Swiss-Prot record:
Gene3D superfamilies xrefs: 3.30.160.810, Translation factors
Molecular-function GO term, any one: structural constituent of ribosome
Single GO cellular component term: cytosolic large ribosomal subunit
Pfam family, one: Ribosomal_L3
Signal peptide: none
NCBIfam families associated with the record: L3_bact (TIGR03625)
Keyword Methyltransferase carried by entry: no
Assigned keywords, A-Z: Ribonucleoprotein, Ribosomal protein, RNA-binding, rRNA-binding
Function, in words: One of the primary rRNA binding proteins, it binds directly near the 3'-end of the 23S rRNA, where it nucleates assembly of the 50S subunit.
Gene from which the chain derives: rplC
UniProt similarity note: Belongs to the universal ribosomal protein uL3 family.
Identification of the protein by name: Large ribosomal subunit protein uL3
């Protein structure tokens, strides 16, 4: 079966009790409603995908090229517009322009991959950014406690290798957490309770897709 996907908003974390009265930490995700605004086909575009729109926005804040896409689809402008790749050409037949998607596309007990933008931490040193252990706290160590150490020899190799872990900007990256359990689907509120943590801040945009490594559950 083709992978399903939906755009949503992370509302925060809470905890619920399962059937055995054990506490389960969950992330609450407002999933949809999404509207299908365009369908990509191999014959016309060279690949299979579906374009989804999500979130409220004033039409005055949407530029003309994007407004044209919404007009062609016959839907009101939305805040977010994203394209989800489909597994094969046959999966395209499950969608049509103007179709509305809600949290009901997932079921209790299914597994999903959640993608979001991680929290930005600003400029961070190697201990925070990469988990370096730092240097000695005493025995002659002076003002080097949190320094990374050598980043390369002066004569050989006479340069810093690409990919060397150094201080720099941390966070604000696209992150995917795989194989998270959907603890419960609230169809009435279009809300997903996903076991565990998902990337990003409260109020951030997330993409929820069927788990690619576990298949349909």
């Amino acid at each position: 079966m083709a992978r399903k996907g939906i755009l949503g908003t992370k509302l925060g974390m809470t905890q619920v009790f399962d059937e055995n009265n054990k506490v389960v930490p969950v992330t609450v995700v407002k999933a949809g409603p999404n509207v299908v605004t365009r369908i990509r086909t191999p014959e016309r575009d060279g690949y299979s995908a579906v374009q989804l729109a999500y979130g409220e926005i004033s039409p005055r804040k949407v530029n003309k090229p994007v407004t044209g896409q919404y007009t062609a689809a016959g839907v009101n402008p939305r805040r977010h517009l994203a394209e989800l790749r489909l597994d094969d050409a046959e999966a395209v037949t499950e969608y049509e322009v103007g179709q509305e998607l809600t949290a009901e596309i997932f079921a209790d007990g299914s597994y999903v991959d959640v993608t979001g933008t991680s929290k930005g931490k600003g400029f961070a040193g190697t201990m925070k950014r990469h988990g370096f252990s730092g240097q000695g706290a005493s025995h002659g160590a002076q003002a080097v406690h949190r320094r990374p150490g050598s980043i390369g020899g002066c004569a050989t190799p006479a340069r810093v290798f690409k990919g060397t872990r150094m201080a720099g900007r941390m966070g604000n990256d696209r992150v995917t957490v795989q194989n998270l359990l959907v603890h419960k689907v609230d169809a009435e509120q279009s809300v997903l309770l996903i076991k565990g943590a998902v990337p990003g801040r409260t109020g951030g945009l997330v993409t929820v897709r069927s788990a690619i490594k576990r298949g349909e559950k």
